[in-house]
C-alpha cells in the first residue's frame, strides 16, 4: 500500500518497521522481522531507514521489561552480518526506549531514543525528578472573590459546604479547558501568591472555586498556577486518578499557548 502511494513522487519513501515485543498495538512479531525487512527492501518505492519497538511496561514492570530489551537487541544483533556488508537492508536508526526505558535500562544496539514525558520535565520513575525541570505550566487568573458564610454550598451537588466563614475565589478554568473534573474531592490545590490554596467542591466546565481565606490580599486578576514548577503535574495526575501524559495532552485548544525561550545569559 505505501509502496503504491509513494510511486507517483518518483522518490523512495523512508519508512521505519515496528517490531512487536509485547505491546500488542501494531508491528510484526520478532520471528517475522527478517522476512518483513527483506520484503520492504524488495519494494522499489520504499527505503527502510529505521527499526524500532515500544516498551509496554517500562515504568511499572522491570522484570518484564528486560525481556523486550533482550529480544530486540538479539534481533538487531542477528542482522549484524548484513550491517557489516553495508547492505541497504540494514536500517540506519534503531530505537526502543521511551522515557522510562532511557532512565532505567540500557540497550546494546539502539542509536536513538524516544523520550516523551521527559521532554516536559516530568519523570515517569521515582528518584529522577530532581534532575528534571518542568517546562510546561498551566495558569489562569482569579476572576471573582466573595466572602461567604458558614453553611454555604460550593459548586454542583454541594459536595463542599463551608464550615466557617470563608473567602472564596472563582478561577477562570475548568474541565472544558482540560483541568480534570476527576480531581474533585481529592484535596487538590492551586498556587496563588506563592501559597497553596485548596479547591472547593467540584470542577465545573469553565470555573473552579478556591478557598483564599489565608490570602487577605488576594485580588481579582492574580495569577493562578494549576500545575508547573510549584504544583507538580504528577501530583495533579495522582489526585485525578490518571497519568501525567493524559494531563498534558488534555489541555484543550481554547487555552492560550505561550512559548518562551530561555535566555542564554
What are these regions (language model features)?
Residues 1-80, 84, 90-95, 108-109:
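Active-site-proximal beta-alpha core segment in soluble small-molecule metabolic enzymes
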Residues 1, 8-9, 66-82, 88-265:
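Active-site anion/phosphate-binding pocket segments in diverse small-molecule metabolic enzymes
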Amino acid at each position: 500500500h505505501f509502496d503504491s502511494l509513494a510511486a507517483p513522487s518518483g522518490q523512495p519513501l523512508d519508512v521505519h518497521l515496528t517490531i512487536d515485543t509485547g505491546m500488542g498495538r501494531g508491528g510484526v512479531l520478532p520471528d517475522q522481522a527478517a522476512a518483513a525487512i527483506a520484503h520492504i527492501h524488495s519494494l522499489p518505492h520504499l527505503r527502510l531507514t529505521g527499526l524500532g519497538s515500544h516498551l509496554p511496561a517500562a515504568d511499572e514492570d522491570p522484570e518484564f521489561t528486560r525481556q523486550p530489551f533482550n529480544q530486540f537487541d538479539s534481533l538487531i544483533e542477528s542482522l549484524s552480518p548484513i550491517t557489516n556488508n553495508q547492505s541497504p537492508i540494514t536500517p540506519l536508526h534503531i530505537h526502543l526506549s521511551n522515557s522510562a526505558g532511557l532512565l532505567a535500562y540500557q540497550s546494546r544496539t539502539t542509536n536513538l531514543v524516544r523520550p516523551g514525558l521527559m521532554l516536559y520535565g516530568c519523570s515517569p520513575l521515582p528518584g529522577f525528578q530532581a534532575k528534571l525541570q518542568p517546562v510546561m505550566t498551566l495558569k489562569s487568573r482569579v476572576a471573582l472573590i466573595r466572602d461567604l458564610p458558614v453553611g454555604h454550598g460550593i459548586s454542583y451537588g454541594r459536595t463542599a459546604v463551608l464550615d466557617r466563614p470563608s473567602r472564596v475565589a472563582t478561577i477562570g478554568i475548568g474541565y472544558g479547558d482540560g483541568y480534570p473534573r476527576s480531581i474533585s474531592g481529592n484535596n487538590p490545590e492551586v498556587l496563588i501568591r506563592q501559597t497553596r490554596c485548596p479547591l472547593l467542591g467540584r470542577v465545573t466546565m469553565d470555573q473552579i472555586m478556591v478557598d483564599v481565606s489565608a490570602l487577605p490580599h488576594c485580588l481579582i486578576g492574580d495569577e493562578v498556577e494549576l500545575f508547573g514548577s510549584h504544583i507538580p503535574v504528577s501530583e495533579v495526575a495522582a489526585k485525578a486518578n490518571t497519568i501525567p501524559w493524559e494531563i498534558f495532552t488534555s489541555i484543550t485548544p481554547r487555552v492560550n499557548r505561550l512559548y518562551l525561550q530561555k535566555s542564554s545569559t
